[in-house]
């Protein structure tokens, strides 16, 4: 895989972007690459003696090698577990592109690949003037879409893909992640998604119970190099 960085987004919130990002980090490391994660903006943080910390950002840090400083991985750690724009207003924090770009540049200098995880679904804004598309353009990286397999996934996947492309960005692949283990016709839905989405398919993850080490699933994903 020749990419030096990419942005992981999803069809919605709670569809496994962090877990998929961690799997991708382990996959890259297994290929001998130095791979680090980044969560530019995270809402829903717990205060500790080292400051505000976000569970997803900590998972990315644990899956990274080398292990970057937390503040590089997650420049904006917002306390409230709500939409980032609201969380930033409540925390009286102004999310700006410059600190995000600076952290990304430092991470890129430390690793062969940087896996940047977004917030919520693709259209979730970071603030009143910065969308995720704005950030991705500033970082000059392509996008990977995580599709949560549950009822309605066809609509969400097609809309998300169309939105990314309408924003003038490259969507270089998609990953199916089973959210609802009781979803009817999973294989049929997966087959239709593979027919309808005009981007490369990187693999399918079954429903994963809590506590599974993402490293054990690294061989299930097969990025089609860029």
Swiss-Prot record:
Active site per the UniProt annotation: 39
GO terms assigned for molecular function: ATP binding; dethiobiotin synthase activity; magnesium ion binding
Keyword Manganese tagged: no
Ligand binding (substrate): 43
Chief subcellular location: cytoplasm
Cofactor: Mg(2+)
Keywords from the UniProt entry: ATP-binding, Biotin biosynthesis, Cytoplasm, Ligase, Magnesium, Metal-binding, Nucleotide-binding
UniProt GO BP: biotin biosynthetic process
Binding site for ATP: 14-19, 56, 117-120, 177-178, 206-208, 213
Any matching Pfam family: AAA_26
Enzymatic reactions: (7R,8S)-7,8-diammoniononanoate + CO2 + ATP = (4R,5S)-dethiobiotin + ADP + phosphate + 3 H(+)
Residues annotated as signal peptide: none
One annotated Gene Ontology cellular component of this protein: cytosol
Protein location: Cytoplasm
Residues given in the record as Mg(2+) binding sites: 18, 56, 117
Enzyme Commission code: 6.3.3.3
Domain of life: Bacteria
Family matches, as SUPFAM superfamilies: P-loop containing nucleoside triphosphate hydrolases
Pathway(s) this gene product operates in, as recorded in its UniProt entry: Cofactor biosynthesis; biotin biosynthesis; biotin from 7,8-diaminononanoate: step 1/2
Oligomer status and interactors: Homodimer.
NCBIfam families membership: bioD
The family this protein is said to belong to: Belongs to the dethiobiotin synthetase family.
Function description: Catalyzes a mechanistically unusual reaction, the ATP-dependent insertion of CO2 between the N7 and N8 nitrogen atoms of 7,8-diaminopelargonic acid (DAPA, also called 7,8-diammoniononanoate) to form a ureido ring.
Protein name as annotated: ATP-dependent dethiobiotin synthetase BioD
Gene: bioD
């Amino acid at each position: 895989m020749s990419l030096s960085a990419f942005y992981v987004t999803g069809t919605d919130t709670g569809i496994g972007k962090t877990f998929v990002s961690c799997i991708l980090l382990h996959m890259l490391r297994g290929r001998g690459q130095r791979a680090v994660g980044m969560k530019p903006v995270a809402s829903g943080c717990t205060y500790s003696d080292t400051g505000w910390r976000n569970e997803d950002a900590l998972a990315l840090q644990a899956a990274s090698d080398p292990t970057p400083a937390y503040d590089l991985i997650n420049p904006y750690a917002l306390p409230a577990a709500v939409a980032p724009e609201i969380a930033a207003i409540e925390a009286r924090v102004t999310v700006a592109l410059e600190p995000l770009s600076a952290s990304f540049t430092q991470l890129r200098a430390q690793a062969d690949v940087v896996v940047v995880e977004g917030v919520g679904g693709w259209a979730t804004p970071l603030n009143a003037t910065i969308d995720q598309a704005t950030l991705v353009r500033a970082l000059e990286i392509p996008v990977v879409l995580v599709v949560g397999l549950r009822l309605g996934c066809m609509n969400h996947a097609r809309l998300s893909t169309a939105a990314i492309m309408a924003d003038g960005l490259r969507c270089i692949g998609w990953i199916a992640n089973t959210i609802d283990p009781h979803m009817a016709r999973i294989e049929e839905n997966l087959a239709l998604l593979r027919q309808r989405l005009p981007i490369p398919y990187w693999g399918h993850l079954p429903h994963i119970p809590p506590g599974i080490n993402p490293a054990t699933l690294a061989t299930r994903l097969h990025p089609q190099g860029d």
